Protein backbone atom coordinates (compact mmCIF):
# COMPACT_ATOMS: atom_id res chain seq x y z
CA UNK A 1 0.00 0.00 0.00
CA UNK A 2 2.84 2.41 0.79
CA UNK A 3 4.16 2.15 -2.77
CA UNK A 4 0.80 3.07 -4.31
CA UNK A 5 -1.34 6.17 -4.45
CA UNK A 6 0.32 9.56 -4.86
CA UNK A 7 3.90 8.35 -4.58
CA UNK A 8 5.30 11.70 -5.70
CA UNK A 9 3.79 13.42 -2.65
CA UNK A 10 5.17 10.68 -0.40
CA UNK A 11 8.59 11.04 -2.00
CA UNK A 12 8.57 14.82 -1.54
CA UNK A 13 7.66 14.35 2.12
CA UNK A 14 10.52 11.91 2.70
CA UNK A 15 13.00 14.21 0.98
CA UNK A 16 12.03 17.23 3.08
CA UNK A 17 12.11 15.44 6.45
CA UNK A 18 15.09 16.21 8.66
CA UNK A 19 16.76 12.80 8.55
CA UNK A 20 20.36 12.93 9.85
CA UNK A 21 20.41 9.18 10.50
CA UNK A 22 19.18 8.27 7.03
CA UNK A 23 16.16 6.32 8.26
CA UNK A 24 14.13 7.44 5.26
CA UNK A 25 16.69 6.48 2.63
CA UNK A 26 15.10 3.04 2.03
CA UNK A 27 11.71 4.73 1.64
CA UNK A 28 13.13 7.22 -0.85
CA UNK A 29 14.81 4.48 -2.86
CA UNK A 30 11.65 2.36 -2.95
CA UNK A 31 9.44 5.30 -3.96
CA UNK A 32 11.88 6.37 -6.67
CA UNK A 33 11.72 2.88 -8.17
CA UNK A 34 7.94 3.00 -8.63
CA UNK A 35 7.61 6.70 -9.46
CA UNK A 36 5.99 7.11 -12.90
CA UNK A 37 8.29 8.46 -15.59
CA UNK A 38 8.29 12.22 -16.01
CA UNK A 39 6.84 13.18 -19.38
CA UNK A 40 8.75 15.67 -21.50
CA UNK A 41 7.01 18.72 -23.02
CA UNK A 42 7.13 17.05 -26.45
CA UNK A 43 5.02 14.21 -25.02
CA UNK A 44 2.33 16.46 -23.52
CA UNK A 45 -0.57 17.94 -25.47
CA UNK A 46 -1.34 21.46 -24.28
CA UNK A 47 -4.85 22.48 -25.25
CA UNK A 48 -6.88 25.56 -24.47
CA UNK A 49 -9.13 24.77 -21.52
CA UNK A 50 -6.82 22.20 -19.94
CA UNK A 51 -7.25 22.72 -16.16
CA UNK A 52 -3.51 22.34 -15.47
CA UNK A 53 -2.68 25.46 -17.48
CA UNK A 54 -3.12 28.61 -15.32
CA UNK A 55 -5.17 31.57 -16.51
CA UNK A 56 -2.12 33.84 -16.41
CA UNK A 57 -0.42 31.79 -19.13
CA UNK A 58 -3.45 32.15 -21.39
CA UNK A 59 -3.48 35.89 -20.70
CA UNK A 60 0.20 36.03 -21.68
CA UNK A 61 -0.62 34.14 -24.87
CA UNK A 62 -3.24 36.77 -25.69
CA UNK A 63 -0.73 39.55 -25.03
CA UNK A 64 2.00 38.04 -27.21
CA UNK A 65 -0.01 36.49 -30.04
CA UNK A 66 -3.28 38.44 -30.16
CA UNK A 67 -1.73 41.77 -29.14
CA UNK A 68 -4.58 42.17 -26.66
CA UNK A 69 -5.08 42.62 -22.92
CA UNK A 70 -7.50 39.89 -21.91
CA UNK A 71 -8.89 38.76 -18.56
CA UNK A 72 -9.18 34.97 -18.39
CA UNK A 73 -10.96 33.32 -15.48
CA UNK A 74 -11.39 29.64 -14.68
CA UNK A 75 -14.15 28.35 -12.40
CA UNK A 76 -13.04 24.76 -11.71
CA UNK A 77 -16.12 23.91 -9.66
CA UNK A 78 -18.23 24.58 -12.77
CA UNK A 79 -15.65 23.51 -15.33
CA UNK A 80 -16.16 26.88 -16.99
CA UNK A 81 -13.83 29.48 -18.49
CA UNK A 82 -14.44 33.11 -19.42
CA UNK A 83 -12.32 35.37 -21.61
CA UNK A 84 -13.02 39.06 -22.16
CA UNK A 85 -11.14 42.07 -23.44
CA UNK A 86 -10.11 44.36 -20.60
CA UNK A 87 -11.93 47.67 -20.31
CA UNK A 88 -10.21 50.38 -22.29
CA UNK A 89 -8.08 47.95 -24.28
CA UNK A 90 -7.70 48.63 -27.97
CA UNK A 91 -8.92 46.10 -30.49
CA UNK A 92 -5.94 44.96 -32.54
CA UNK A 93 -6.04 43.86 -36.16
CA UNK A 94 -5.07 40.38 -34.97
CA UNK A 95 -8.37 40.04 -33.12
CA UNK A 96 -10.65 40.50 -36.11
CA UNK A 97 -8.40 39.56 -39.00
CA UNK A 98 -5.39 37.35 -38.33
CA UNK A 99 -6.95 35.21 -35.57
CA UNK A 100 -10.62 36.06 -36.00
CA UNK A 101 -13.22 37.07 -38.55
CA UNK A 102 -15.58 39.98 -39.01
CA UNK A 103 -18.34 37.88 -37.45
CA UNK A 104 -16.31 36.25 -34.67
CA UNK A 105 -13.26 37.94 -33.20
CA UNK A 106 -10.40 36.04 -31.60
CA UNK A 107 -11.67 36.62 -28.03
CA UNK A 108 -14.99 35.00 -28.91
CA UNK A 109 -13.19 32.06 -30.48
CA UNK A 110 -10.79 31.83 -27.54
CA UNK A 111 -13.73 31.63 -25.13
CA UNK A 112 -15.31 28.88 -27.22
CA UNK A 113 -12.05 26.91 -27.36
CA UNK A 114 -11.50 27.23 -23.62
CA UNK A 115 -14.92 25.70 -23.03
CA UNK A 116 -14.42 22.93 -25.63
CA UNK A 117 -17.12 24.39 -27.85
CA UNK A 118 -17.11 24.98 -31.60
CA UNK A 119 -18.30 28.49 -32.38
CA UNK A 120 -21.38 28.87 -34.55
CA UNK A 121 -22.32 32.07 -36.39
CA UNK A 122 -26.05 32.72 -36.77
CA UNK A 123 -28.19 35.27 -38.59
CA UNK A 124 -31.56 36.68 -37.54
CA UNK A 125 -34.57 36.00 -39.77
CA UNK A 126 -37.50 38.31 -40.35
CA UNK A 127 -39.62 36.38 -37.85
CA UNK A 128 -37.03 36.73 -35.07
CA UNK A 129 -35.51 33.27 -35.30
CA UNK A 130 -31.81 32.60 -35.71
CA UNK A 131 -30.35 30.33 -38.36
CA UNK A 132 -26.83 29.12 -38.84
CA UNK A 133 -24.67 30.94 -41.38
CA UNK A 134 -22.68 28.06 -42.84
CA UNK A 135 -20.03 30.12 -44.62
CA UNK A 136 -19.37 32.41 -41.64
CA UNK A 137 -19.37 29.44 -39.26
CA UNK A 138 -16.83 27.55 -41.37
CA UNK A 139 -14.57 30.62 -41.53
CA UNK A 140 -14.81 31.12 -37.76
CA UNK A 141 -14.06 27.48 -37.01
CA UNK A 142 -11.03 27.55 -39.29
CA UNK A 143 -9.69 30.49 -37.27
CA UNK A 144 -10.56 28.73 -34.02
CA UNK A 145 -8.61 25.65 -35.06
CA UNK A 146 -5.64 27.82 -36.05
CA UNK A 147 -5.81 29.56 -32.67
CA UNK A 148 -5.82 26.30 -30.71
CA UNK A 149 -2.96 24.92 -32.80
CA UNK A 150 -0.90 28.06 -32.22
CA UNK A 151 -1.50 27.83 -28.47
CA UNK A 152 -0.41 24.19 -28.32
CA UNK A 153 2.99 25.12 -29.77
CA UNK A 154 3.35 28.51 -28.04
CA UNK A 155 3.08 26.90 -24.59
CA UNK A 156 6.39 25.07 -25.03
CA UNK A 157 8.36 27.78 -26.86
CA UNK A 158 9.69 29.56 -23.76
CA UNK A 159 12.00 27.29 -21.69
CA UNK A 160 10.98 28.52 -18.22
CA UNK A 161 7.29 28.18 -19.03
CA UNK A 162 7.81 24.76 -20.60
CA UNK A 163 9.66 23.48 -17.53
CA UNK A 164 7.08 24.91 -15.14
CA UNK A 165 4.03 23.58 -16.99
CA UNK A 166 5.55 20.16 -17.67
CA UNK A 167 6.32 19.92 -13.96
CA UNK A 168 2.76 20.88 -13.09
CA UNK A 169 1.36 18.31 -15.53
CA UNK A 170 3.56 15.54 -14.14
CA UNK A 171 2.67 16.48 -10.57
CA UNK A 172 -1.03 16.16 -11.36
CA UNK A 173 -1.09 13.25 -13.78
CA UNK A 174 2.16 11.29 -13.41
CA UNK A 175 2.24 10.81 -9.65
CA UNK A 176 -0.19 7.98 -8.95
CA UNK A 177 0.57 4.27 -8.81
CA UNK A 178 -2.30 1.80 -8.57
CA UNK A 179 -2.04 -0.77 -5.78
CA UNK A 180 -0.83 -4.20 -6.80
CA UNK A 181 -2.67 -6.87 -4.84
CA UNK A 182 -0.83 -10.17 -5.17
CA UNK A 183 -2.63 -13.15 -3.66
CA UNK A 184 -0.36 -15.92 -4.90
CA UNK A 185 1.02 -16.44 -1.39
CA UNK A 186 -2.42 -16.99 0.19
CA UNK A 187 -3.22 -20.52 1.45
CA UNK A 188 -7.04 -20.07 1.36
CA UNK A 189 -8.03 -22.60 4.06
CA UNK A 190 -11.35 -24.34 3.44
CA UNK A 191 -11.07 -24.08 -0.34
CA UNK A 192 -12.38 -27.14 -2.19
CA UNK A 193 -9.51 -29.30 -3.34
CA UNK A 194 -11.01 -29.62 -6.81
CA UNK A 195 -10.93 -25.86 -7.38
CA UNK A 196 -7.77 -24.00 -8.37
CA UNK A 197 -8.26 -20.22 -8.24
CA UNK A 198 -6.81 -18.14 -11.03
CA UNK A 199 -4.29 -15.37 -10.50
CA UNK A 200 -6.87 -12.56 -10.72
CA UNK A 201 -9.12 -14.36 -8.22
CA UNK A 202 -6.29 -14.64 -5.71
CA UNK A 203 -5.52 -10.96 -6.31
CA UNK A 204 -9.16 -10.12 -5.58
CA UNK A 205 -9.00 -11.99 -2.26
CA UNK A 206 -5.81 -10.12 -1.35
CA UNK A 207 -7.52 -6.82 -2.15
CA UNK A 208 -10.51 -7.68 0.06
CA UNK A 209 -8.19 -8.59 2.93
CA UNK A 210 -6.29 -5.32 2.50
CA UNK A 211 -9.14 -2.89 1.87
CA UNK A 212 -11.86 -4.63 3.84
CA UNK A 213 -14.27 -4.21 0.95
CA UNK A 214 -14.41 -4.72 -2.81
CA UNK A 215 -16.76 -5.03 -5.75
CA UNK A 216 -15.97 -8.06 -7.88
CA UNK A 217 -17.09 -7.95 -11.49
CA UNK A 218 -15.46 -11.20 -12.55
CA UNK A 219 -17.01 -13.27 -15.33
CA UNK A 220 -18.54 -16.56 -14.20
Give a label for each model feature.
Residues 163-219:
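Conserved pre-motif I regulatory segment
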Residues 1-175:
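Charged, low-complexity intrinsically disordered regions
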